[in-house]
Amino acid sequence: MAKLHEDQFHKILDGQIEEAISWQEEHYSRDRKRNYEAYLGQADAAPAGRSQAVSWDVFETIEAALPDLIEILCSGDHIAEFEPVGEEDEQFAEQATDYINYVVMKQNPGFLIFNTWIKDALLSKIGVVRAYWATSEKVTTKEYTGISDDDLTQLLSAEDAEVIEQSQQDDERDVAQRAHMRAALNVMDPMQRQLADAYLQTPVRQVYDVTIRTTRKRGRVYVDNVQPENFIITPRAKTMAAADLVGEIKSLSRSDMRELGYDKEKVREIQSFEAPQDRSAGIAQTATDESHDHNYDFDSEGDDATEEVRVFDGFIRVDYDGDGIAEWRRVVRGSNVTLVNEEAEGHDFAAMSPILIPHSLIGIALADPVVPIQTSSTAMQRQYIDSLMLANNPRTYVNTTAGVNLNDLLDNRIGGIVRGTQPMQTALAPLLTHNVADSALQGIEFNDSKREARTGITRYNQGLDADSLNKTATGVAKIMTAGDRRKLMMARIMAETGIKDLFRLLLRIVTENQDKP
């Protein structure tokens, strides 16, 4: 089988990317946007003059579950441990455990990464992180004055040291010492005079003024959160390992691409991939995307350095070399130009869902079963408030022929006077309105119990157990235990999927790239 031609490879890649984007838009975008809006307390506005109250069930559920999940997964000495296969592996496993945990929690902002990762999973069905090796350069420039040959040699022996400026002159101390010797020659004994003459015949010692620039290259592992709405994967993939396409659609400025070392001509020509339609569904409303969502009109002489281009940055498994075996390749591509196409050991993403669906990588978000309850509770709260308002300020029938002063009637001051010319019984009558406040409260309580049954997040394991005094100690303990088990189950799923994959990925990256401590 012949090696894939570039056009064939691009056709396969573009087709898989388009399929993955379409699959996400069709199956997940609407739910994700709905969940984020519910989490932020956004709801349809009621008619003017009616209650605009919103129930925050999704927010309460997510924020109640998050601290416990963080504590379960991140509070120990080690987030994860590597187990030795045999006795000869014990030392390596111990070192790998210590170092990879150090990479996650110390070299990277581990707590913030896990906080975002878990919250993404609870809200968006899937949380995604990406681990990769990157090299950074630290350039330092120092000036040295009056250093010797030996000192200069030692400075230049440092890795990546470069002399920018250099000048030399006689060492003033050596010049002064020689003058002192010449003045004392007449009083020296023959042996001392012979040594002094020999010294005076040598060249004057030189000293140097130099400016040295040192460039230190240091590589390390980075772990970044990936916005779920930007993440794309082979449709219907059952696991991360089973996917043939894994990546993200992200925005890079042309300046960023040039700094990353991509071909300048390709950077000039590259055009954007069409982004997933639900990019605005993120918690931050993807403010940065909106700020760049303009129709730039750059001419050939204009500065296009800040223009944002949406590119696919990810991995595809394909038989590129024609040997009959599909291999992973890392690709960075716009809609018309490929910036990177290189062989890779595997992809660098790790993903997890809090509630698994059999035979599917992307499961159910904790927010999914709560959103309908929030919609119902919002309606109940509004009816409760509207009912109280109508009870305290009922509508009134007015006999317009009874001489009632309407201005007095509409002025709802406490102790106010309403003037009229006929008895009140014949002039005014309240319109009967059924008070549904009690029924609305019962509906809200029913919704709360349904939310607890669906999520396992109860008022007892949230610390909101004011009426637990009316329960038996055994009954409350059973409720708390059931809720804790649901959270422990979610934590176990996250540990067995995304976290385990992340630590395996980090060990592979460190083993491949780390050349010094």
Range-by-range predicted roles:
Residues 1-517:
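Extended alpha-helical, oligomerization-prone segments that build pores/tubes and scaffolds
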